[in-house]
Amino acid sequence: MAGREKVTVRDIVRAKQRGERIVMVTAYDYITAKLVDEAGVDMILVGDSLGMVVLGLPSTHQVTLEDMERHTAAVARAQPRALIVADMPFMSYEASTRDAVLNAGRLIAAGADAVKIEGGASYSDTIRALVRAGIPVVAHVGLTPQRYKLLGGYRLAGKTASEAMEVIREAIGAEEAGAFAVVIEFTAWEVAREITRKLSIPTICIGSGPYCDGQVLVIHDLLGLTPTPPPFAKKYVDLAAIIRRAVSEYASDVRNGRFPGEGMYWGMKRGEYEKLQRLINEQAGSGD
């Protein structure tokens, strides 16, 4: 999307109408948000994936609403042009629509422009309640990581016709409930293409093929920071190797006395060191 004005929900919806591909990437902190925004992404997802790639947790289940608030606020401080979408973490919207609205409101207050929930038609009441409260919603169908235990692990969605129809129904229901976009995760590409054709709102794929209106990747996968990235992620740079090399060089410089070098440290004003020495000697002589 051209220009430097703030990207809005309307801009995202219009991008599909214009045939413009939507670029989405995750960010969880101020510096990363600034960098990806300067690179020209359209949407920044503050994903609950931060649990694994930032906090070292075993899954998204341990991510709290407070975690999401803190990282959303950090991203928002970068004042990105991109639209900020914050994930609603596990059990922050499932119990009741009231909980969903109150918790989503906290993420909006933290700086999100929209929230994402895992689900579509099955959470139509929740989506409607959020939209009614003035909170833009991105739905999420196909593989839904928050329900990986129920699904029996991280499995490709839509492998059979009956499974595919269920994913399609979820996506259609999300649009009918008022979602302005749908993320389709790790789903058979034919199913993602059918959903994209059927919906008037944008579809954003992750591991679901090239026929969606946009794509999203976890920034750590994109930059080569993840030890075991998913098979659908493309590593655009081996930043892990670059970081290891840089820190190794720094450690070597410290141990060999090469860091800090000239121009990286400063002294006292002329004559002040001599005064300091006299003061130190006087103090030593007084026995204090």
Curated annotation (Swiss-Prot):
InterPro entries registered for this protein in UniProt: Pantoate_hydroxy_MeTrfase (IPR003700), Pyrv/PenolPyrv_kinase-like_dom (IPR015813), Pyrv_kinase-like_dom_sf (IPR040442)
Protein's pathway: Cofactor biosynthesis; coenzyme A biosynthesis
Requisite cofactors: Mg(2+)
Catalytic residues (UniProt): E185 (proton acceptor)
Compartments it resides in: Cytoplasm
Record-listed 3-methyl-2-oxobutanoate binding positions: D48, S49, D87, K116
The reaction(s) this protein catalyses: 3-methyl-2-oxobutanoate + (6R)-5,10-methylene-5,6,7,8-tetrahydrofolate + H2O = 2-dehydropantoate + (6S)-5,6,7,8-tetrahydrofolate
GO CC entries: cytoplasm
Presence of the UniProt keyword Cell division in the record: no
Top-level enzyme category: transferase
EC numbers: 2.1.2.11
Ranges in coiled-coil conformation: none
Cofactor binding note from Swiss-Prot or TrEMBL: Binds 1 Mg(2+) ion per subunit.
UniProt-listed SUPFAM superfamilies: Phosphoenolpyruvate/pyruvate domain
Subunit comment: Homodecamer; pentamer of dimers.
Entry's family note: Belongs to the PanB family.
Identification of the protein by name: 3-methyl-2-oxobutanoate hydroxymethyltransferase
Organism of origin: Hyperthermus butylicus (strain DSM 5456 / JCM 9403 / PLM1-5)
